[in-house]
């Protein structure tokens, strides 16, 4: 049994620290990406090209789709033939830690498609559960096996200075680690991520089918500095959820004892929903969660990704698109803040942050 990453001197850097690269997966699952994923593939391509300006992009694509991916991307990425069940690299990829000698360690969590038999979104996730270890093997990095502890990368944020941010709604959900107490879960996070403190937000984004991942509702943008998804509409269920998160954050400090500067990032003014036109595009397998017309999607500008040279921000053809870009431009003066049309990723059930996973330098 390997010592915990914390005992070995490893920690999880912040996303805004320098990257060696980014892991992504080509979107091909018919139950996630409607109409052969054509629109999703265009969106993924724009994201990959933007990230690739400042770092290496590793793209997992199975042999059957390699020619297709190459027709979009040419030689902009490193193609790896690692099998997957879907394209959520944030949740299936490894969490890569560093130590002060610059050595890296990949943490491999158990993955059960956001809830297993209790409320998972698909039932065959065998390949997804192997992505982290297989990718770490390609990178030739040692692996810390955190299994059977169930966790997705989208469920944690790190400030790189000892503070981990999570939501209670996700980490305490019955489909993850029902046999563990909150205290045991917190201790596992601290030991596995080399951290000093876990901050538990009560909620994420309304109707988020990941049981409200933190990466859709709040994110570190600097030392003791956060953005939080927000609405002023008291009739929106999101209002009470964001308000509870804000009240907690205003009382909290980071691992070093500093109070947070909190920037409110509005959610889109117009609700993003599944339409009748979207529905014929999906092809589901047995036991897979199905979409319905009028279903509210968990749209949030907080699901941005911080690459070496750019911050990639979801856009929804909404009045708040530019507001989000302006706020994030102030948070990241040294990076290009790029809006990416993101409805076609949202239709798959996540957004830009959910399909990317940073590999620290």
UniProtKB/Swiss-Prot annotation:
Its EC number is 3.5.3.12. Pfam families: PAD_porph. One of its GO terms (molecular function) is protein-arginine deiminase activity. It catalyses: agmatine + H2O = N-carbamoylputrescine + NH4(+). GO terms for biological process: putrescine biosynthetic process. The active site is at residue 354. InterPro entries: Agmatine_deiminase, Peptidyl-Arg-deiminase_porph. It comes from the Bacteria. Belongs to the agmatine deiminase family. This is Putative agmatine deiminase. It comes from Streptococcus pneumoniae (strain Taiwan19F-14).
